[in-house]
Regions:
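N-terminal export/targeting signal detector
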Residues: 1-5
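Compact, glycine-rich, soluble single-domain proteins
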Residues: 7-99
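Charge/polar-rich, low-complexity and marginally structured segments
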Residues: 92-119
Length: 119
């Protein structure tokens, strides 16, 4: 299977430059599979799982949104954040989830209080 260039950039700099056989990710238009010689594409990327295949080996990542640009045999991803499954710190992720849930609860409580005051 023919390969194409994939370049992933984050706010911290170049994350990876690799030659891949296939790229799979979720864009704002839905799930997309990219192969060599794909038609030109520019789209937003959803916060989701992303994977690529190199010589039948699948590499999995968590991507924190961004943009993808495809032109012939070169694909560029500008990601807000990205981590391979090996890089994800499960304890840190659980703590971040707990903090986010707490913030949502606080916003809901404040919203309910404001609604009560207005009524």
């Amino acid at each position: 299977m023919t390969k194409f260039k994939l370049k992933i950039v984050t706010p911290s700099g170049i994350y990876q430059e690799v030659e891949v056989n296939q790229l799979n990710l979720r864009t704002t238009a839905g799930q997309v599979g990219i192969l060599a010689h794909h038609m030109p594409l520019a789209s937003g990327i959803e916060i989701s799982e992303m994977s690529y295949i190199i010589d039948k080996q699948r590499h999995i990542f968590a991507i924190g949104g961004g943009f993808i640009y495809v032109n012939d045999d070169e694909t560029k991803i500008i990601a807000n954040s990205i981590e391979s499954k090996e890089e994800i710190d499960l304890n840190r992720a659980k703590e971040a989830k707990r903090r986010a849930e707490q913030r949502i609860k606080e916003v809901t409580e404040k919203t309910d209080l404001l609604r009560a005051e207005i009524a």
